[in-house]
């Protein structure tokens, strides 16, 4: 029985090491999403973001202020652990994000950890037909 418990403990330890992809002790990886540009109100700096479960990220979303941008990514927001949100130097600790709305020029930073793999689409409400859609791919 003692040998079985020793084997089980070692197997459990090894499987934990193999399944863990992230190391939260490492500095969060920066991701940037810029909405609007000097040439187009409907430009997005990036449409696809790839990340891994268990790793820390900081998503910086900035707006040029030409349009009101309402970012909807409900499925993605439900599958991340939100560490904090910073809006113009003010840090908020919120457990859940429903949407992010930028009514004027500004920046929002979300610090988070993806907890479930999947392909999660996001869009800018009312501007999908202008190409303001994207995807978060979590491995």
Predicted segments with their positions:
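Extracellular/periplasmic metallocenter environments
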Residues: 21-27, 43, 95-139
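N-terminal signal peptide c-region/cleavage motif recognized by signal peptidases
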Residues: 15-17
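Short aromatic-acidic-glycine turn motif
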Residues: 77-88
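N-terminal edge beta-strand
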Residues: 23-58
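Short beta-strand and strand-turn-strand segments in soluble, beta-rich domains
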Residues: 41, 87-95
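Soluble periplasmic/extracytoplasmic beta-strand elements of cell-envelope proteins
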Residues: 32-34, 58-60, 123, 135-137
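Beta-strand cores of secreted/periplasmic/IMS beta-sandwich domains, seen most often
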Residues: 46-75, 108-115, 121
């Amino acid at each position: 029985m003692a040998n079985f418990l020793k084997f089980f403990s070692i197997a459990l330890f090894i499987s934990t090491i193999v399944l863990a992809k992230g190391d939260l002790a490492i500095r969060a990886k920066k991701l940037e999403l810029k909405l609007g540009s000097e040439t187009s109100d409907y430009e997005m700096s990036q449409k696809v973001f790839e990340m891994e479960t268990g790793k820390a990220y900081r998503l910086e979303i900035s707006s040029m202020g030409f349009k009101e941008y309402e970012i909807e990514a409900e499925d993605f927001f439900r599958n991340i652990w939100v560490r904090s949100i910073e809006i113009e130097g003010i840090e908020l600790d919120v457990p859940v994000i429903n949407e992010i709305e930028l009514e004027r020029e500004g920046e929002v930073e979300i610090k988070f950890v993806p907890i479930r793999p999947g392909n999660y689409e996001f869009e800018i409400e009312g501007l999908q037909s202008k190409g303001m859609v994207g995807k978060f791919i979590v491995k």
